[in-house]
């Protein structure tokens, strides 16, 4: 085995272990934020939505800067520093009794993610061969689902005692992850050339096709982020107990572990990436619309199952499509910018979703936020369809001219 192949194989195992630690640390804390501050402390959902949206926007919106800096200085220092900042954010969250302190803790957490998330994504693109990326992204998603359940179960159990224990556990896991990277991650370069920060950012901004695709995905993310805000609140309201939230993540884990990899393997042989992304988004959108009308836990979990199936179909295709569009000369910058759709959609989804949830509750129209999210998903589906048809038309024109 050549040294390059050996490095790739070792890199795969490193990425999987690193991802599990990050997912555990995140899901111990974040699914329980809405339960803690909305249900236990009586805050308005929009206040918590602002906190979650701030974290999302900071982490993903500034991702291009984190990626560009990593292109220049390498992945290791950015990842280690970012994970320590995330740990500090969780520690601060444990003592938050005022909205401004919760917002500050989410700001710290988001800045940490800005530093470590783009270089970690770029390492996947660097180490995994193009023809294997779809399957590897599916493995990461399966791991995400299992880690989400374990983290949510652990967090729910700790929440019975004290929310500070929840946050302390998340902080410790990120400190361990920082130590793991500091000890074992080689000083790998992310890009084929040592790209200056400004040049990497400029290269991305000139790629109009990539920019349009990323911004359109904001609508997709407005739906996706509700697993952290409105879906846990809805499950808690219908079940009457916060412990039911863990079953929501258990459903995701079961579906992901049984369906994600087989669906990815089968669909990559029969369907284009664009079609898989659009089909998944359509299922997610249609499953969102009736959520506000259900009154039983069984009906709610059925709709959540459909939503997760849509995500299982769409997410590996979205990741693979984003990676395939990235320029190898500025991988960090591209993978950082690819998070901008998540920044915009996540922020609007959290803040707007929280506001609509409060509005629907006060107006006795609980279906309002869910119908709006479904409509946004349908419009995003149509916008992506138009973009992909334009791209195919341009490709046919080039082939004819040749």
From Swiss-Prot:
UniProt keywords, alphabetically: Antibiotic resistance, Cell inner membrane, Cell membrane, Membrane, Transmembrane, Transmembrane helix, Transport
GO BP annotations, alphabetical order: response to antibiotic
Membrane-crossing segments per the record: 13-33, 99-116, 139-159, 165-185, 214-234, 244-264, 277-297, 300-320, 340-360, 368-388
CDD domains in the cross-refs: MFS_MdtH_MDR_like (cd17329)
Keyword Cell inner membrane included in the entry's annotation: yes
Domain of life: Bacteria
GO MF term (any one): transmembrane transporter activity
Periplasmic domain ranges by topology: 34-98, 160-164, 235-243, 298-299, 361-367
Ranges in the topological domain labelled Cytoplasmic: 1-12, 117-138, 186-213, 265-276, 321-339, 389-402
Subcellular location: Cell inner membrane
Topology relative to the membrane: Multi-pass membrane protein
Primary localization class, coarse: membrane
GO CC aspect terms: plasma membrane
Induction context: Induced at least fivefold by indole in a dose-dependent manner.
PANTHER family documented for this protein: MULTIDRUG RESISTANCE PROTEIN MDTH, RESISTANCE PROTEIN MDTM, PUTATIVE-RELATED-RELATED
HAMAP family, sorted: MFS_MdtH
UniProt cross-references to NCBIfam families, sorted A to Z: PRK11646.1 (NF008650)
Function: Confers resistance to norfloxacin and enoxacin.
Family: Belongs to the major facilitator superfamily. DHA1 family. MdtH (TC 2.A.1.2.21) subfamily.
Protein name per the record: Multidrug resistance protein MdtH
The species this protein was found in: Escherichia coli (strain K12)
UniProt lineage: Bacteria, Pseudomonadati, Pseudomonadota, Gammaproteobacteria, Enterobacterales
